[in-house]
Amino acid sequence: MRREPPSLLAMSAHYDLLIIGGGINGAGIARDATERGLSVCLVEKSDLASATSSSSTKLIHGGLRYLEHYEFRLVRESLIERERLLAIAPHIIWPLRFVLPHDKGLRPKWMLRLGLFLYDHLGGRKLLPATRTVDLRTAPHGAVLEDRLTSGFEYSDCWVEDSRLVVLNCLDAKERGADIRTRTECVALDRRKDVWVADLRAADGSMEQVLARNVVNAAGPWVDSVLSRALPAERHENLRLVKGSHLIFPRLYDHDRCYIFQNKDNRIVFAIPYERDFTLVGTTDVLFKGDPQGIDISAEESRYICDAVNEYLRTDVSPEQAVASYAGVRPLYEDKSASNSTVTRDYQFEIDMNGPPLLSIFGGKLTTYRKLAEHALEKLGFDGPSWTSTKPLPGGDFPATDFEKLLADYQKRYSWFPAEGMRRLLRAYGSRTEAILKGTQKPADLGQHFGGDLYERELQYLVDQEFALSAEDVLKRRSKLYLHLSAEEQARVADWFARREQAA
């Protein structure tokens, strides 16, 4: 890429650490590094969590199926992290119970029982209830299943608001001194004797040059592209891109249990209660080639998901019944596995020390992001005590078992605010909901009403604190209000951002 002459570039700060990529890995590293005394700059070419990190099945889980592939270390680490993350972010992470029906001809019951025994005991489970056997002929959540499914198991894992997990890590990093820049692309990286020189391009096209002693390449599906930019003389083909897609249906059943369905191809599909009125179903595992930006579910994937549901639920579904869908690409480390579903979900590092260090990250999962961040910083030589395992994320400074108590307190103090709306606010912001509602006594005090329980005060908070710059940032990532607001109501949010931009 042609370099701009120095006169056209604004020279900026000198950082200890430049992080390229605003997904969960980059966000977790930024948070951890700031408390270790490092000066940090994170750049993301779009919005935070705009790619893989907002396209997950939204689970903090041990990875039950990874036991089949003997990934015991990954499962153990994931189970330990599941408990830690639930403790530091109980507003956006909460327990779920999963029903695993036993289907004759697939995995035998003894194998499922053994796997779940290991799942209960590998990670020192404390906060979540244990596995139990269920008689699906009499259990309430067996009523929606096909008659052939008479027994199964019930076990625990956790839900997470995936994109909010990213945003809250970046918010905490910012409050500890990190420079978080969205809509900013690193378009060139030059290695000098003891420093990296990075050219950054903002959304308005303006260029800035920053210096960094270390660079972390956490660009997810674009990690090889960044490597090629930084080390153009070398060949970089470390990724296997695997596409995962989901469908969102109107509620398929009327209880709070999730289901894990085994398929004849040895894959699994989850059905999870979602956003009060919906059921989230996925995911797929499809080899992907091409540009990972802005991908959609394919007709074949939609049919695959529906077929999986129809094998287990009494009520058949079709792709046409879905109210929404989303797809993302998992940037997995290419380990030459024969199947996309058996490629390791563990993370791998590649570090180049021929001059100032460049650390590239491959793979990883939401559940292990915090541990990945610690390992990444240790790999770069930044040792220090582990602090992120106990320090709550913004809004998460209350016991994991006390969410309903917190909700009752807020409903008492702000009794005029709708009950479901209050639950949504507390599930998003936790104790920081106070920053939105403080000083208000009636809806009019919250400013313009956009529909549902969304008011201007919340939008302003998201702009001021959580890096939101567009309606999509708010409606699809910092919340899932796009599922609840009409097209007209969503247009009002877009108009608010447009007016704000014009006034700037």
Regions found by a protein language model. Give the residues of each.
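Extreme N-terminal leader/targeting segments of oxidoreductases
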Residues: M1-L17, D32-R36
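Dinucleotide-binding Rossmann-like beta1-alpha1 core, especially the glycine-rich loop
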Residues: K58-G142
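Flavin (primarily FAD) binding-site architecture
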Residues: N217-P232
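C-terminal catalytic lobe of FAD-dependent flavoproteins
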Residues: S156, D162-R164, D172, L231, ...
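Glycine-rich Rossmann-fold phosphate-binding loop(s) that bind the pyrophosphate
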Residues: G22-G23, K45
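Short hydrophobic core segments
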Residues: L18-I20, V210-G220
